[in-house]
Amino acid sequence: MKLLVLMTLIAIATIAYLKMSKAAPLLVSSDVAPNFNLPDANGKIHQLSDYAGQWLVLYFYPKDDTPGCTKEACHFRDDLAILEKLGAKVVGVSVDDGQSHGAFAKKYSLPFPLLSDIDGLTANKYGALTNLGLVKIAKRYTFLIDPQSRIAKTYFSVDTSRHSLEIIDDLTELKAK
């Protein structure tokens, strides 16, 4: 009996490891941004091509209405006018559903789209998915995508209290080149 339990646990651990190891490689500057086709809280489908010709701040975050994610989203909200003046749109992505996104956006007056990547396929294409088998969580990664739909800058280590300011600084510098 103990051997059967041990073998079952080993099989489960192996399956979980194999699922986690299928993550896409991390994207780097100049890579073509992977396309996405995701609904927002109202069911409207957003695609990368919708943002062609403009800068896009595509940020992945773990969970609606949690402390770090709320801080990050509210800073993007507060700095949105500056980002838009620089020609950028902001879009958030997590594995939460549209209902969760709608409640989160309403609670904090978030004026930008939050997209539902329930199956985690888009997060995985961006290398931004933690897949634990039954549980999938988006990593806190951000991609600054240029008007030609190429990755201009990646952010894999994010300080939620100043992340939007870091993007403003980088976007200002990139546009000056």
Where are these regions (language model features)?
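N-proximal helix/coil linker or "cap" segments that precede and/or mark the start of modular domains
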Residues: 5-35
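Short loop/turn microsegments at loop-to-beta-strand junctions
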Residues: 33-34, 55, 139-141
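A short beta-strand-turn-helix
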Residues: 36-55
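Short active-site neighborhood of thiol/selenol oxidoreductases, capturing the structured segment around
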Residues: 49-70
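Structural microenvironment flanking redox-active thiols in thiol-disulfide oxidoreductases
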Residues: 70-110, 121-122
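Structural micro-motif
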Residues: 110-112, 129-132, 136-143
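Thiol-/selenol-based redox modules, centered on thioredoxin-like
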Residues: 137-177
